[in-house]
Amino acid sequence: MTRLTHLDSTGAARMVDVSDKPSTTREALAEGQVVMAPETLALIQSGNAKKGDVLGVARIAGIMASKRTHELIPLCHPLMLSKVEVEVTPDEALPGLHVVARVKTAGQTGVEMEALTAVSVACLTIYDMAKAADRGMRIENIRLLEKSGGRSGDWRAA
C-alpha cells in the first residue's frame, strides 16, 4: 500500500518537504456540477438572477479560491500559479451548470488541490447566488479529471 505523505513515522501530520524536487510544469483539470430546476437554469442564463451575473461571478470566485488553496487546506504548499481557467457551461440535460477548472504552474508540487478548490468554490458560489430561486440545487461529481507533470507522471480519470 502507498504511504500517506502527509504523515510522519509516528502518524503525526506534517507538510511534505519538496525542496529537493525539481521544478517542472504541472497541470490539473477538475470538474463538478450544480444540478438545479430547469427554471433556475433559465433564470441564470437570462442574466436576471437577483444577485447578478452568476456565471461571471462563479468564474472569478473559482479563480480567486484556487490562489488561496494553501490557506484553506492544511498542509498544502503555497504555489505561484501561472494559469487558472474556470469555465461554467449550462447543461440542459442535467439540468444545471457544468464547472471545469484548469490550473498550471512550474513548481515542485502539483496543482490538483488548486483545481479541485476552484471547482468547489465556483459551485458553492453558484448555489449562493441562485439559492433564493432554488434551495433544492445539488452540487455533485466534483473530481479530478487529469493531472500532468511531476515524479508520479500523468494521470487521467477512467
Curated annotation (Swiss-Prot):
HAMAP family: MoaC_B. InterPro entries: MoaC, MoaC_bact/euk, MoaC_sf, MoCo_biosynth_MoaA/MoaC, Mopterin_CF_biosynth-C_dom. The gene is moaC. Pathway: Cofactor biosynthesis; molybdopterin biosynthesis. Belongs to the MoaC family. The keyword Lyase applies. The active site is at D128. This is Cyclic pyranopterin monophosphate synthase. One of its GO terms (molecular function) is cyclic pyranopterin monophosphate synthase activity. Homohexamer; trimer of dimers. It is an enzyme of class 4 (lyase). Its EC number is 4.6.1.17. It comes from the Bacteria. The lineage of its organism: Bacteria, Pseudomonadati, Pseudomonadota, Alphaproteobacteria, Hyphomicrobiales. Keywords: Lyase, Molybdenum cofactor biosynthesis. Catalyzes the conversion of (8S)-3',8-cyclo-7,8-dihydroguanosine 5'-triphosphate to cyclic pyranopterin monophosphate (cPMP). It catalyses: (8S)-3',8-cyclo-7,8-dihydroguanosine 5'-triphosphate = cyclic pyranopterin phosphate + diphosphate.
